[in-house]
């Protein structure tokens, strides 16, 4: 299979999606299929007064912690416990919980909702603090995710990604929909609906914009979509293909793959569509650019060696130095994505007759397969670098999946009766 044949699936896959029935903004269903090697036992009580709120905050917190694969939920019973209530930490420790969470949800006079909670270490017998979160009714789920992020940070020592968002493409009723959801696939809404395919969504570093390729004018054009306002601008509408947008870490520049000169090459363009400049100079096909976290390098896919492999060049282009090959395990590797700390590379490798998600240590160059599926594509790191979101197939139907970088924890996110593709995991929210 040629490079353009395989990568052409990124352009054509949207037209092959199965129509999704039901609500236009269908929610993703999450199935956790694995857990971490060790799990932290925690009890999260029902929050006081949440029975009268539109969202059961404590339930969302428990679900977040469970799907991370790093926690096991100890039954806290049905009795609500407020953050102001006295807590017998010794009794919770005796029940097997090393941490305990209590809280409350209250509707304020202005119609907003206030979530308060407190986290306890039952082993040391001390409080680990808490937060007060105020939001409109529509923000209650996000408040719950922020509670889970706080717990994750205090007990795991790193940032959680429950309060981040996902983007992906669904086809329903003959229209293509770019949808934005919470990290658990809930609270989904449509950012763009079109009768033509939408592919390759990419989040801006500040999480307020998504770049993507739309075929609404019967050809691929790169747009930037401002999510709060819905305003769009054209970034690249060159002759031929305009594809694979990737943001620089400072949000000022995008790398794109264009065929305006013949074979597809990598270009850079300012985020307002000005200042187009060519970065790769050869006669090969160069595509799928991805910036390193420090913005100094660009990883990309090229067939310059005969078969598709992943290369690295200066963000200033090949005029600043020849690109260096990065992948050597396997004869066919595409779709590079660099971890937020710059230490790992996720990519898709052809294994036998299928395509599997791999991760490579960029210091030791050791490559490891993470999945047992054979139709993997479009990897995207979580903002904390602990998980990778990707598209694949289960029982012949397109789904999204997430796997921890150690391969132990796996989640499948699907839409009832249909297929979903083109995932991108958003950054930490500002």
Swiss-Prot record:
The Tol-Pal system is composed of five core proteins: the inner membrane proteins TolA, TolQ and TolR, the periplasmic protein TolB and the outer membrane protein Pal. They form a network linking the inner and outer membranes and the peptidoglycan layer. This is Tol-Pal system protein TolB. It is found in: Periplasm. The keyword Signal applies. Pfam families: PD40, TolB_N. Belongs to the TolB family. Residues 1-26 form the signal peptide. The keyword Cell division applies. SUPFAM superfamilies: TolB, N-terminal domain, Tricorn protease N-terminal domain. One of its GO terms (biological process) is protein import. Keywords: Cell cycle, Cell division, Periplasm, Signal. NCBIfam families: propeller_TolB. Part of the Tol-Pal system, which plays a role in outer membrane invagination during cell division and is important for maintaining outer membrane integrity. GO terms for cellular component: periplasmic space. InterPro entries: 6-blade_b-propeller_TolB-like, PD40, Tol-Pal_TolB, TolB_N. Gene3D superfamilies: TolB, C-terminal domain, TolB, N-terminal domain.
């Amino acid at each position: 299979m040629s490079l353009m044949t395989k990568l052409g699936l990124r352009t054509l896959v949207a037209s092959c999606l199965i129509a999704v029935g039901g609500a236009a903004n269908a929610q993703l269903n999450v199935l956790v299929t694995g857990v971490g090697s060790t799990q932290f036992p925690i009890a999260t009580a029902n929050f006081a007064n949440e029975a009268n709120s539109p969202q059961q905050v404590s339930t969302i917190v428990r679900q977040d912690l469970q799907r991370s694969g790093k926690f096991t939920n100890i039954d806290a019973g049905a009795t609500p416990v407020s953050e102001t209530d006295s807590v017998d930490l010794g009794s919770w420790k005796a029940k097997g919980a090393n941490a305990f969470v209590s809280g409350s949800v209250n509707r304020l006079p202005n119609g907003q909702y206030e979530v308060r909670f407190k986290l306890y270490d039952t082993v040391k017998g001390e409080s680990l603090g808490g937060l007060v979160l105020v939001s409109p009714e529509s923000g209650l789920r996000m408040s719950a995710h922020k509670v889970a992020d706080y717990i994750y940070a205090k007990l795991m020592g790193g940032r959680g990604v429950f309060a981040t968002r996902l983007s992906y493409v669904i086809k329903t009723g003959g229209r293509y929909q770019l949808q934005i959801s919470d990290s658990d696939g809930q609270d989904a809404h449509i950012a763009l609906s079109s009768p033509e395919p939408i592919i390759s969504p990419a989040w801006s570093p500040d999480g307020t914009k998504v770049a993507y390729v739309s075929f609404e004018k019967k050809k691929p054009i790169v747009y930037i979509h401002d999510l709060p306002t819905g305003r769009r601008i054209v970034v690249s509408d060159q002759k031929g293909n305009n594809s694979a947008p990737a943001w620089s870490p400072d949000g000022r520049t995008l790398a794109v793959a264009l065929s305006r000169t013949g074979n597809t090459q990598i270009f850079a363009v300012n985020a307002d569509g000005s200042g187009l400049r060519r970065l790769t100079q050869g006669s090969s096909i160069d595509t799928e650019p991805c910036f390193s976290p420090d913005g100094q390098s660009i990883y990309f896919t090229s067939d310059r060696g005969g078969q598709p492999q992943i290369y690295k060049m200066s963000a200033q282009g090949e005029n600043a130095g020849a690109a260096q090959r990065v992948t050597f395990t396997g004869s066919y590797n595409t779709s590079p994505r660099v971890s937020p700390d710059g230490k790992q590379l996720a990519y898709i490798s052809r294994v036998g007759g299928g395509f599997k998600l791999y991760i490579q240590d960029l210091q030791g160059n050791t490559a490891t397969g993470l999945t047992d599926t054979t139709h993997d594509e479009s990897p995207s790191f979580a903002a904390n670098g602990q998980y990778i979101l990707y598209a694949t197939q289960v029982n012949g139907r397109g789904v999204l999946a997430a796997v921890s970088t150690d391969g132990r924890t796996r989640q499948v996110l699907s839409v009832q009766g249909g297929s979903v593709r083109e995932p991108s995991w958003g950054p930490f929210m500002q």
